[in-house]
Amino acid sequence: MFKEFKIFIMRGNVVDLAVGIVIGAAFGAIVNSLVKDVLMPPIGLLLGNVDFGNLFIVLKEGAIGGPYESLLVAQTAGAVTINYGVFINALINFLILAMAIFFFVVRPLNQLAARQKSKEAVIPAQTDKKDCPYCDTQIPLKASKCPYCTSELM
């Protein structure tokens, strides 16, 4: 049983999947840091010192009454909130990740496939057959007589 499991794990596609998941998680962490630490602070500064992580709407106050200075204070007080700032961060994070995957993975693969397809279209298929000029059936290229209509070929 262990031997079968070892064979399964060592298959190429399982290892490739594991590597893809690890690299994808690392890439997601990089994009998340890019959005949170590099892009959002200048955008927040341009909009008047807005911290998108602290944009929220209080639906129900917690044990300690509001107004709450930050999302963390509201959550600590037990307030029920809609965290639309966190959602905006996640949305920007997703858009950047989707654009990166499109431009660095999907688009190059599509271009490679199109290039491969155009190479196949340019190279004519070499065949060892020809059409009989009398009955229009496929016959061997070296045939001197058609086996179907028995016509003499030149």
Curated annotation (Swiss-Prot):
Under Pfam families, the record lists:
MscL (PF01741)
What membrane topology does the annotation report for this chain? Answer: Multi-pass membrane protein
Annotated Gene Ontology MF terms? mechanosensitive monoatomic ion channel activity
| Residue spans crossing the bilayer | 14-34, 86-106
Localisation per UniProt entry: Cell membrane
One GO CC term, this protein = plasma membrane
InterPro entries in the cross-refs = Mechanosensitive_channel_CS, MS_channel, MSC/AndL, MscL_channel
User: Which UniProt keywords are given for this protein, alphabetically ordered?
Assistant: Cell membrane, Ion channel, Ion transport, Membrane, Transmembrane, Transmembrane helix, Transport
**Protein purpose:** Channel that opens in response to stretch forces in the membrane lipid bilayer. May participate in the regulation of osmotic pressure changes within the cell.
Q: What does the similarity note say?
A: Belongs to the MscL family.
Task: Provide the assembly information.
Answer: Homopentamer.
The name on file for this protein is: Large-conductance mechanosensitive channel
Its organism's taxonomic lineage begins at:
Bacteria, Bacillati, Chloroflexota, Dehalococcoidia, Dehalococcoidales
